Structure formats: C-alpha cells, structure tokens
Amino acid sequence: MPVIYINLIAAFFMAFMGLLIYRSHLMSSLLCLEGMMLSLFILNSTLALSMHFTLYSMMPIILLVFAACEAALGLSLLVMVSNTYGLDYVQNLNLLQC
C-alpha cells in the first residue's frame, strides 16, 4: 500500500477522533465532518486515477456533491441554533422540547 493512501486513511481517522472528542460544540463537529469528507474525496480521486476504471471516476464527484449538501445543511442548522439559543453547545440543547 503506497504511503499516500496510509496518510489519507490516517487523516480520515484523525478527523473522526476529533469528531468524537470535540462533539460538545456544533462548529467543531462540522469542521471534523468536513475533514473526513475531504480526506475521503482525495482518497477516492487518487483511487479513481490509479485504477483507470471509467465508472469509478464519477464517485468522487458524487461524494463532493454530498459533502456540499452536508455543509450547507450543517451551517444552516448552526445559524438557526445560534440565533435561537445564542450558543453552539450541543450538550445544552434539548431536541425534545418544542
């Protein structure tokens, strides 16, 4: 396995560990999710280039579309929560209240 794949997998798991550690703030969680999606995008792009498989070349673009939708939804949720409650602490929010 080439070194670049090991580095990209390590970057994914570091972002995942950051997501587990910094889950109290919504902004930190969103940044860690973006790091995970970026490492997956680069990994899929390098795999698509090295495999020369035509159908697999669309996979990074589809992943990038999902990452953009996830980022837009996460930022809109962050703006809504910060306007409503004035903070982005996830632990202080109770989603069962109306």
Curated annotation (Swiss-Prot):
Core subunit of respiratory chain NADH dehydrogenase (Complex I) which is composed of 45 different subunits. This is NADH-ubiquinone oxidoreductase chain 4L. It comes from Echinops telfairi (Lesser hedgehog tenrec). The keyword DNA-binding does not apply. It is a multi-pass membrane protein. The chain crosses the membrane at residues 1-21, 29-49, 61-81. Gene3D superfamilies: 1.10.287.3510. Keywords: Electron transport, Membrane, Mitochondrion, Mitochondrion inner membrane, NAD, Respiratory chain, Translocase, Transmembrane, Transmembrane helix, Transport, Ubiquinone. One of its GO terms (cellular component) is respiratory chain complex I. The gene is MT-ND4L. Pfam families: Oxidored_q2 (PF00420). Belongs to the complex I subunit 4L family. It catalyses: a ubiquinone + NADH + 5 H(+)(in) = a ubiquinol + NAD(+) + 4 H(+)(out). GO terms for biological process: ATP synthesis coupled electron transport. It is found in: Mitochondrion inner membrane. Its main location: mitochondrion. The keyword Electron transport applies. Its EC number is 7.1.1.2. It is an enzyme of class 7 (translocase).
